[in-house]
Amino acid sequence: MMKNEVNTLEIPAISVILATKGDKLGFLKNCIVSLKKQTFRNFEIIVVSKKFPKQLEDLFESEHMRFLEEKGSTLGAARNFGVKNAKGKLVSFIDDDAEAPTDWLDKIYMTFSRFPSLCCLGGPHFTPKDESGKNPLSLVEGIFFEAHSEKTYFDKSAIAKIGGCNVTYKKSVFQDIGYINEKLRTCEDWEFQRRLAENGYSLRFDPEIWVLHHRQGLKHAFQGSSKSAPFFLSWKTFKLLRYDFFFASFYAMHSLFITLIIILFISPYFFVLIFLSLLFGYMGIYAVRTKIYDRRIFYFSLVILLTATKIFGFYFGLIKYGAFKLHTLFARSASSVENSSSRPS
């Protein structure tokens, strides 16, 4: 067997599941190419999508690559379908706009071999340096999130750090606690990890197991928020805040600072908007806890407060206008009465 061939005679140790909509073919190609360059060879690649990407057909001319057609509407549904068809004892998830270094699977396999009780392993996802300035979300996340990617975290404290674009599970845990929640359009990875932690499974965030992630910016910032809101505002989620409260509060306070500056110069309803700032700022904690802080934490409270400012300003102006009109009307009426009474009979 040649060095770069995959051992197809064995059952693969790892199944890499790559769920995609097929709308980012350039990124998808780079992701697949990065997986084919792995130094670890006993693995399979499963691409799950609604439609086969014909433009990349040549990349699938390999026995260790499979394409699965899945018509579900969520990422969770696609990944579940991949897990159910996976042959490996470990299943790794990577996003279609991410790229793995050549030793990514080697490090994953070695870590699971070193810690037999480990059930969930994740690592950081860094924005490529040449893209970090293309949108403010990438820049801000690069400064703040990556600063927290140098330590190893375990179990419940690891949940806030592990992202769905770079995570590996033992396949057996899906049979034990169920599959990913297919109703959620976002946060489904963290919801699954929360269930693992609550059932006593071992989780680990390892800064050495990283991928590059080409982030999509503002256009996906609020995707799926309405269906996921009941989850990340639930009491169970709130209880887990204590495991990473200061990490979450850091982002919330950043949000509060921005909104505070704005309301000081815009709205006469200072104390009302201070309350709203606190409310939506600390919703940022939930955003952090559900792994969506990279898209919402810096903008969510800002958008809401600007909207609130406009609403308050509108009603404030409307009330003032109404009061002015009423005052004018009464003034005219009083003036008419006064003029009538002052006329000689």
Model-identified regions with their sequence ranges:
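A recurrent flexible, glycine/aromatic-enriched loop bordering the glycosyltransferase active site
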Residues: 150-169, 185, 220, 242-243
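N-proximal low-complexity "stem/linker" segments adjacent to membrane-targeting elements
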Residues: 1-34
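Short, flexible, basic/aromatic active-site loop/helix in glycosyltransferases
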Residues: 123-124, 141-159
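Glycine-rich, basic loop-to-helix element that forms the pyrophosphate-binding segment
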Residues: 70-86
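Short aromatic/hydrophobic "clamp" motif used to bind/position activated sugar donors
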Residues: 91
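Short, acidic, metal-binding catalytic loop of nucleotide-sugar glycosyltransferases
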Residues: 33-42
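Conserved donor NDP-sugar-binding/catalytic core segment of glycosyltransferases
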Residues: 103-136
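Catalytic donor/gating beta->alpha subdomain of glycosyltransferases that bind UDP-sugars
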Residues: 181-185, 190-241
